[in-house]
UniProtKB/Swiss-Prot annotation:
PROSITE patterns assigned: RRM (PS50102)
Subunit and interaction comment: Homodimer; Upon poly(A) binding, undergoes a dimer-monomer transition that removes the polyproline motif from the RNA recognition site and allows it to be replaced by the adenosine nucleotides of poly(A).
Subcellular location: Cytoplasm
CDD domains, per the entry: RRM_II_PABPN1L
Source organism superkingdom: Eukaryota
One Gene Ontology CC term in the entry: cytoplasm
Function, as annotated: Binds the poly(A) tail of mRNA. Unable to interact with the cap-binding complex and is therefore unlikely to be involved in translation initiation.
Domain called RRM: residue spans: 93-170
Protein name (Swiss-Prot/TrEMBL): Embryonic polyadenylate-binding protein 2-B
Pfam families for the chain: RRM_1
GO molecular function, one term: poly(A) binding
Keywords: Cytoplasm, RNA-binding
Length: 218
């Protein structure tokens, strides 16, 4: 006597195999894990694209430098090492900008100082531990006469703040390179080269005088 196998209408063997796979809890867990990993990768990709769009590096940095090599092109990274003469020449074409808003970018500063002349480099200093901006920047111009035009913008309002613009010096603004500190006056010592409250030992020397005439009673 032959056995009859009841089959549901409209389902073939492939459909039944797929239905069995969907009922497997381990397979469900694997698929959920893969889906979570894909979503996490998409989220990180979106954050990375956002950081690049605003010109902020995701790694901790001491300073964020935007160098304008060509029109509309910027590069990030620390400046290349320069000789002492090259640094002095660059400093003569640069200005210090203080009280800069922490959310400012190099593009914002370029737009504010674009009327002063062609800009070669904009450096926004960052804290080496947190990576957050310190609130001041340096702007290097292509020509020296642009420095005077930039200094004329001292105490102008930039992003709601009154900025301070000064010619850049080799050292920090307000600190003289020749000031070594310390007292340079002539020290005032005690007379006689002995401490207060002490007297020299022995009888004081009175010098030799000329003997006066002897009175002879005889």
């Amino acid at each position: 006597m032959s056995e009859r196998v009841s089959e549901e209408p409209g389902l073939d063997k492939g459909d039944r195999a797929e239905e069995c796979e969907l009922d497997d809890p381990e397979l469900k867990a694997i698929r959920m894990r893969v889906r979570e990993m894909e979503e996490e990768a998409e989220r990180l990709k979106g954050l990375s694209g956002q950081d690049k769009s605003i010109g902020v590096s995701t790694r901790p940095c001491m300073q964020t430098t935007h160098s304008k090599m060509t029109a509309g092109a910027y590069t990030e990274g620390p400046p290349q090492p320069l000789s002492a003469e090259e640094k002095k020449e660059i400093d003569k074409r640069s200005v210090y900008v203080g009280n800069v808003d922490y959310g400012s970018t190099a593009q914002d500063l370029e737009a504010h100082f674009s009327s002063c002349g062609s800009i070669n480099r904009i450096t926004i200093l960052c804290d080496k531990f947190s990576g957050h901006p310190k609130g001041y920047a340096y702007i290097e111009f292509a020509e020296r006469n642009s420095v005077d035009a930039a200094v004329a913008m001292d105490e102008t309002v930039f992003r709601g703040r009154t900025i301070k613009v000064l010619p850049k010096r080799t050292n920090m603004p307000g600190i003289s390179s020749t000031d070594r500190g310390g007292f340079r006056g002539r020290p005032r010592g005690n007379r006689g080269n002995y401490q207060r409250g002490q007297r020299p030992r022995g009888r004081p020397f009175r010098g030799r005088g000329r003997p006066g005439p002897l009175n002879n009673p005889y």
